[in-house]
């Protein structure tokens, strides 16, 4: 399973990647913003899931999510928002835009694993 992690913080990308690796998911691709994320999706058409931050430069996570959903292959791709945007209206906006789940930072490894479990395959 290949997972794309998109966050402008290299520290956060490393934290999320380490959580995924500790669960046995070694095939991880990273991007620093939505534009780079779209480029990674084009370069890696076999991505099985995307975890994306909301607040990023160049293209934010909500716009990135919308761009993914506009493509035929992306319409079924699980996309999980991982963000500090904890307000109810933001959660609703992300789900309406097509997010499959929503993780609020800060989080624990158990929260990430539990939220991703329905979408993960080994």
Where are these regions (language model features)?
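Receiver (REC) domain active-site loop signature in two-component systems and cognate sites
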Residues: 56
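Helix N-cap/capping motif at the beta->alpha junctions
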Residues: 30-39, 61
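C-terminal output helix
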Residues: 107-116
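Two-component/phosphorelay signaling modules centered on CheY-like receiver
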Residues: 10-29
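Short amphipathic alpha-helix used as the core "switch/output" element in two-component signaling
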Residues: 39, 62-75
